[in-house]
Amino acid sequence: MNRLLSSGMSAATLQTRMASQLLINDSKYGFLKELGLTENNAGVFHGKWAASGQVVQSFAPANNSPIANVQNGNVQDYEIAISEAKKAYNDWCEVPAPRRGEIVRQIGDKLRTQLQNLGKLVSLEMGKISAEGVGEVQEYVDICDYATGLSRSLEGKIFPSERPGHALLEQWNPLGVVGVISAFNFPCAVYGWNNALALVTGNSVVWKPAPSTPLTAIAVTKLVEEVLVANNVNPALCSLVCGEGDVGQALVKDKRVNLVSFTGSSEIGKIVGQQVQARFGKLLLELGGNNAIIVNEDADLNMVVPATVFAAVGTAGQRCTTTRRLIVHDKVYDQVLERLKKAYAQFESRIGCPLDSNTIIGPLHNQQAVGKYKASVAEAVASGGKIEYGGKVLERDGNFVLPTIVTGLKHDSPVVLRETFAPILYVLKFSTLEEAIAINNEVDQGLSSSLFTTNIQNVFKWMGPKGSDCGIVNVNIPTSGAEIGGAFGGEKETGGGRESGSDSWRQYMRRSTCTINYSKELPLAQGIKFE
């Protein structure tokens, strides 16, 4: 900028030129302004929109063009946000749960009104195709519906007391402030899972989104703000601080944050876990996944191939549940591989702009991801692997790569055991189901897995104590595409956290065991006499 000014260009002219380069000023992206976004956006909300950190730009992975400017928050902004969120909690926790559920229902309805626009923003800023972008927003809508019903069924158990004239029961209460640190690959849904359940269980929320997807976070927060204000609820209940690692560090180490929900890599998750545990805070970790599909000899191959393609190349291989290993019985290995290569070849012409309805594979999120893709392909080849399809970076604007199939590697090759966040599929052989299960379980993570079989004995072996060690254990469906009704999460270095359905709501509450003596006597437990 200084160089341009010194060349004689005025500051006003320079600002005009820079503004014209922003995608938000291109009529093609009119949905951005319909979501309330502008050229310059405050990345902090704590009841008011304000920020005092560095001004950054959000970029579109499809062409690496700047979308709009965002002024990040800093630690001082975070301090205001956490203070205001704590104040909002003090009122919200006393609102009856069904009323909280009604407000969450309205959030879902508000999201419905902007479903297409918000889905397009997710696609533009993250890089996933339009169908997946809209589907991600739909997940937030669905979890709002789920949480609304949950608001009338949050339950604690009543137990028989061994003492006469006594009642023994559980009482569940909100935790306080829930801190949500979300990842770039699901910039809307991960917050939605946490936000809906945290609100309905009586908590306030402070959201620190991924640094590369701030516009989605700002647009979502604007919609939530409208609902809270319309219901005379302190809008700081859902606070937002866009920023870098200093903001995340402040949140993780802050004793005022009762639960930290972190979605990201296992490496960073380990650090987050240690820091939160050091202050005896509560944790919800959703980390990496080196997921596998097992294809048994009796599998329906007409189901296997489309399921594998969806799970391996959907979101350009950037889901935590992406299939990265395909473990195929040696009797059907050649047949599966040939079908898979043909399927991949059909999609090559449909790699492109995620907002194009014909596109089925979008870009990687940034150039760093492209670099990791190239490094993993090179390592696979150096380790004796054969590139059956792909293995190349596409020479065009944006961060596009060919989805890749690799064969010929040992199942315990370092590159196979390591999660690469890109569309690289390692195809492996096995002879017995026990061998395949062992291969599935040998990686450090334990998120998602699937077995394709028509043998009911195999199904229950797979689901049992000597089967998959993952948190998600599927049969005859892909590893990705989980429904919101079940608990989502994994074991080992995936972190052990559970979000979304089932009893995941319990992680956002504290449990008290209450013994009530309604008699006029004072008997002690276990028949103890203390006289």
UniProtKB/Swiss-Prot annotation:
The keyword ATP-binding does not apply. GO terms for molecular function: aldehyde dehydrogenase (NAD+) activity. It catalyses: an aldehyde + NAD(+) + H2O = a carboxylate + NADH + 2 H(+). One of its GO terms (biological process) is aldehyde metabolic process. CDD domains: ALDH_F7_AASADH (cd07130). Homotetramer. This is Putative aldehyde dehydrogenase family 7 member A1 homolog.
